[in-house]
């Protein structure tokens, strides 16, 4: 823009122009210092626009009417301060009762299964046609049902995510690598058929139950209700119940494990590949209560992760994946010195046990090798006899059995198990054997420990079908036959799934306030439920994050740097903790800074602790209103009323006939006394009735506006809405539903803007943090819907005005077209106070840029329409930088410990590709051919094999991997209403004015565009990956957060029969060696 001084200068002669140019050059970047944007003019524009837009928002939302109606009832309401400790104790009690019901259902299954097995006599010739979950309803080319594939009636059931199920019968899944008619499986399926009536009875007693099942130690999986299983594209169902966490956790006790891997020269080629896969399968069987390390040996010892020399680490998913990456780097050479490795393994287990950090329960050494030249009895005598508390599990790799006897003896002499793994296809089944050995003490003790898993995603649904987080309660099933008691035979594990949303139903969201929430963690500090848990990421379609089930509380409540809250909850304490928090909203782009009070206690009967967070201020208060049922029912009948679908006003799960009811329908039936079996929250319903009565007049108000066509002639305002603290909503459309610009708004798919189990709507939460009487304006960030950003949402909070306490009782708002909103802005910016009508400055001038930004720095209006929704710092970096320096805005650093970052990885066709059963089979076939050629022609093909099987393709593949990031958010300083500034750039001075829009969260920014100031970089909100150097990575690996061990431990039992150790057939030749532990015992007394 050209100012009056400049125009004056322009009229002078050539000499004056030259003098001015020389002066500008002398001043450097302090130029155009007289060219200021008039603050008074910008103030006028801001005032005009603010008044106009508030008038529209207040008028169409009906905010003043609603505030007036609540004010009229103010004398009839009681305001109470929420007692957080009493609240969390009551919620924990509710959850205990729910968990107890689920545990009892599982206990009934255990009793029925053990009784059925006790009565059954094994019949090797038993022929029994059972319902095979893969084959049911399948026909051959002649139209006849396949064997094991009889007709099995299936019908969609909304209680089971609308999957087709049979609620009268269970069916059986058998892993692809097992024979459907194996006598052991047929007998097991036959006697477990008696579980059907218990499944049905459990479901009748507790209709909120979902999947119930029995996972057999033989490998089959009986599931109720029956459902058809579909193979993958290769015709394979890789699911093996024995490899699931609920099975392993229930079957065994926590354990410390050292895995020894032979990497001597004889292990080259396929043997090393099988060894790696064996290690990987062992890692799959380890859970969060276990600890491990991997040591390779030849002439020397090599820790797979050198940083963890001489210690063990928790077997969480992150650590296991870290070790898997190192497995790919193993290579074979030299000779194997097993004695050194065994000495090291025993010392590591002993030293780690003394730290008190491990499982303090079972201990084991897993030995993976192609042979042993000695029995190393002196080492076992030194470290392990006579107690034999460290079990030895030996895995002989390859078909040769020359050194098998020594390995068998080691396992049998140390209460372990020996297996031989000849091909990749053998790995899974052989690895599983050790779990049944570790289960023996528990079986002999006959201790039916109840176990609960961490949260995981329902495997019956694809990730893009919806998020169903759940936990499983499971119990082991034992053989009760007296003759097998000392053998400790585990029959399997029974369990049932508990959706996390069931836990959330026990939580009265209306008592937690607008920003309040409940959360629960496991004994390891991992999140069971928390509104900030984000298990999925999007890349084309929704996918599970690799480590979603082991997100620690400290990774979402990261402001608690000393883990005070986390550690208190892990240790099952009851108490209170307070801290300032930075809660992100609106897809993480905005931040609310507040102080939270946390209340916590333990949940008895489960390894979980419960917490409640209440935000200070209005979040700590609750009020009770009172109206008659007749009044309330009348106003609930209005068609514009809806209730939060995910809130539990009435329990519609207790009786099947109630499942089809919406919460609003259930309340109406309950109040009318038509459904005496309905159980409802009387206190919440009373407040719903109150809100319905108080907000009822707004329906007529909106209707009158809609009928007056001249009021909204250009149809700029499209929707008016309100929500109350009880989850009650009212909506009014000023245009036809098909004409709405944003078709998703206030619909179930727009999770951010509706009441759900985790949070209040975004427009409600943001309005609550605004100054009472002002509106918060925002545009939705793009989420793939083309026209979604073409609207502006305005909302304001309604408060019960009281001298001391002012709880937010409701929020109202409107949604209008962005074009309508922007037109109002440009109209206001053309006004000026000049009497002659000639404005000194205008947003139409080429020398200025005008913006409308919100309190988080996002652009709502710009002359360049494509900048709408962008962060102001990316467009005007120099101005934003100056605003930060001046204190008009402040930068807040945030952290995301659940992020996914792009990483370049060398793709490999070696070990990981062999997880596929068919690839495993082909690899095994290739190995056999290689061995045959070696035998016939004595020609060394190892180098050919090795290069073909384990060489990595020389190409980089970009993948998304879990990472930690930090990123900024920006918040305006409320006390600063207006600011002017000049920025010294390289060859010019850039002036700007920022002016707050009255009664809003908006700011008008007018910037001198003639000075580009390109030397100042844009300010971006892009997250930056936090990269840890090697020493810090090592420290993070070693660091172990406080955890609580499971209360039960069954590490060993004196009556255990250790003779079944996988090597009984050849023990006779080694009787003398087997007597060594006994001799050692005698001499040690």
Swiss-Prot record:
Database matches in PROSITE patterns: VWFA (PS50234)
Annotated S-S bridges: 412-1049
Protein modification: N-glycosylated.
SUPFAM superfamilies documented for this protein: vWA-like
A GO BP annotation: regulation of presynapse organization
Extracellular side: 34-1062
Tissue: In heart, it is expressed in atrium but not in ventricle.
Protein topology in the membrane: Single-pass type I membrane protein
Transmembrane segments: 1063-1083
Stretches assigned to the Cytoplasmic side: 1084-1085
Family the UniProt entry places it in: Belongs to the calcium channel subunit alpha-2/delta family.
Entry comment, domain topic: The MIDAS-like motif in the VWFA domain binds divalent metal cations and is required to promote trafficking of the alpha-1 (CACNA1) subunit to the plasma membrane by an integrin-like switch.
Protein name (database record): Voltage-dependent calcium channel subunit alpha-2/delta-3
Organism: Rattus norvegicus
């Amino acid at each position: 823009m050209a100012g009056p001084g400049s125009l004056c200068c322009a009229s002078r002669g050539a000499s004056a122009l030259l003098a001015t140019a020389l002066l500008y050059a002398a001043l450097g970047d302090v130029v155009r210092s007289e060219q200021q944007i008039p603050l008074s003019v910008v103030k006028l524009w801001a005032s005009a626009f603010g008044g106009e837009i508030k008038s529209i928002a207040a008028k169409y939302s009906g905010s003043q009417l609603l505030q007036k109606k609540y004010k009229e009832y103010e004398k009839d309401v009681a305001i109470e301060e929420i007692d957080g400790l009493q609240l969390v104790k009551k919620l924990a009690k509710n959850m205990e009762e729910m968990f107890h019901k689920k545990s009892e259902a599982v206990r009934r299954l255990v009793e029925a299964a053990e009784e059925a097995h006790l009565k059954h006599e094994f019949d090797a010739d038993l022929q029994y046609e059972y319902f095979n979950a893969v084959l049911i309803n399948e026909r051959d080319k002649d139209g006849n049902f396949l064997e094991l594939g009889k007709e099995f009636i299936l019908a969609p059931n909304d209680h089971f995510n609308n999957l087709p199920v049979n609620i009268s019968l269970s069916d059986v899944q058998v892993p692809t690598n097992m024979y459907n008619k194996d006598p052991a499986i047929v007998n097991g399926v036959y006697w477990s058929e008696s579980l059907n009536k218990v499944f049905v009875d459990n479901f009748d007693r507790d209709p909120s139950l979902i999947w119930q099942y029995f996972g057999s130690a033989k490998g089959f999986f009986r599931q109720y209700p029956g459902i058809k299983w579909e193979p993958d594209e290769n015709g394979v169902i890789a699911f093996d119940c024995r490899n699931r966490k609920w099975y392993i956790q229930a079957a065994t006790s926590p354990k410390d494990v050292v895995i020894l891997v032979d990497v001597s020269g004889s292990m080259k080629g396929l043997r090393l590949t099988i060894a790696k896969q064996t290690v990987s399968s062992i890692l799959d069987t380890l859970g969060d209560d276990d600890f491990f390390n991997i040591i390779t040996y030849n002439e020397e010892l090599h820790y797979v992760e050198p940083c963890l020399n001489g210690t063990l680490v928790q077997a969480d998913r992150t650590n296991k994946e870290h070790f898997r990456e190192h497995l790919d780097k193993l290579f074979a050479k030299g000779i194997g010195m097993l004695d050194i490795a065994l000495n090291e393994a025993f010392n590591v287990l002993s030293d780690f046990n003394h730290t008190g950090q491990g499982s303090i329960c079972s201990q084991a050494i897993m030995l993976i090798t192609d042979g042993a030249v000695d029995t190393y009895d002196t080492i076992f005598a030194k470290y392990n006899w006579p107690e034999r508390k460290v079990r030895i599990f030996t895995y002989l790799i390859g078909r040769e059995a020359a050194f098998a006897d020594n390995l068998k003896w080691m396992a049998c002499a140390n209460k372990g198990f020996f297996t031989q793994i000849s091909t990749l296809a053998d790995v899974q089944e052989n690895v599983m054997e050790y779990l049944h050995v570790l289960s023996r003490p528990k079986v002999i003790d006959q201790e039916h420990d109840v176990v609960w898993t961490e949260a995981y995603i329902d495997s019956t649904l694809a990730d893009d079908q919806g998020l169903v987080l759940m936990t499983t309660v499971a119990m082991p099933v034992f053989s009760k036959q007296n003759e097998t008691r000392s053998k400790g035979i585990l029959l399997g594990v029974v369990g049932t799934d508990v959706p996390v949303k069931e836990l959330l139903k026990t939580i009265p969201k209306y008592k937690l306030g607008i920003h309040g929430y409940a959360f629960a963690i496991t004994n390891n500090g991992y999140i069971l439920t928390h509104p900030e848990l984000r298990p999925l990421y999007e890349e084309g379609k929704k996918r599970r994050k690799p480590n979603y089930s082991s997100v620690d509380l400290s990774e979402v409540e990261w402001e608690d740097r000393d883990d005070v809250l986390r550690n208190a909850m892990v240790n099952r304490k009851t108490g209170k903790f307070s801290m300032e928090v930075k809660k992100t909203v609106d897809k993480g782009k905005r931040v609310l800074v507040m102080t939270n009070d946390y209340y916590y206690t333990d949940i008895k009967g489960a390894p979980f602790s419960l917490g409640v967070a209440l935000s200070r201020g209005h979040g700590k208060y609750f009020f009770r209103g009172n109206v008659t049922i007749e009044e309330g029912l009348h106003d609930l009948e209005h068609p514009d009323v809806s209730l939060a679908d995910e809130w539990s006003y009435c329990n519609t799960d207790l009786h099947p006939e109630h499942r089809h009811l919406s919460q609003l329908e259930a309340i109406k039936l309950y109040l009318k006394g038509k459904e005496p079996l309905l159980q409802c929250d009387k206190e919440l319903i009373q407040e719903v009735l109150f809100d319905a009565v108080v907000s009822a007049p707004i329906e007529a108000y909106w209707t009158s506006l809609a009928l007056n066509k001249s009021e909204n002639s250009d149809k700029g305002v499209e929707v008016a809405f309100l929500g109350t603290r009880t989850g009650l909503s009212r909506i009014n459309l000023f245009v036809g539903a098909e004409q709405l610009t944003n078709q998703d708004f206030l619909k179930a798919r727009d999770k951010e803007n509706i009441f759900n189990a985790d949070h209040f709507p975004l427009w409600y939460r943001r309005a609550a943090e605004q100054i009472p009487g002002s509106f918060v304006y925002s545009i939705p960030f793009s989420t793939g819907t083309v026209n979604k950003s073409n609207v502006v949402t305005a909302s304001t909070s309604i408060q019960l005005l009281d001298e001391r306490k002012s709880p937010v009782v409701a929020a109202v708002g409107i949604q209008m077209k962005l074009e309508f909103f922007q037109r109002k802005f440009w109209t206001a910016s053309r006004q000026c106070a000049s009497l002659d009508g000639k404005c000194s400055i205008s947003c139409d001038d080429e020398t200025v840029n005008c913006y409308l930004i919100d309190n988080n720095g996002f652009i709502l209006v710009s002359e360049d329409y494509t900048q709408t929704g962008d962060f102001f710092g990316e467009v005007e970096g120099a101005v934003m930088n100056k605003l930060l320096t001046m204190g008009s805005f402040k930068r807040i650093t945030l952290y995301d410990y659940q992020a996914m970052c792009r990483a370049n990885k060398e793709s490999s066709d070696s070990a990981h590709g062999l997880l596929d059963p068919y690839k495993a089979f082909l690899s095994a076939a290739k190995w056999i051919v290689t061995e045959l050629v070696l035998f016939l022609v004595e020609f060394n093909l190892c180098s050919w094999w090795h290069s073909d099987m384990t060489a990595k393709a020389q190409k980089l593949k970009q993948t998304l991997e879990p990472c930690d990031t930090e990123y900024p958010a920006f918040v305006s300083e409320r006390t600063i209403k207006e600011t002017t500034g000049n920025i010294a750039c390289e060859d010019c001075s850039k002036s700007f004015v920022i002016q707050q829009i009255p009664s809003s969260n908006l700011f008008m920014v007018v910037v001198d565009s003639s000075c580009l100031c390109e030397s100042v970089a844009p300010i971006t909100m892009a997250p930056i990956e936090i990269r840890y150097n090697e020493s810090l990575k090592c420290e993070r690996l070693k660091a172990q957060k406080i955890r609580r061990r499971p209360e039960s431990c069954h590490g060993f039992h004196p009556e255990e029969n250790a003779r079944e150790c996988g090597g009984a057939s050849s023990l006779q030749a080694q009787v003398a060696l087997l007597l060594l532990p006994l001799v050692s015992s005698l001499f040690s007394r």
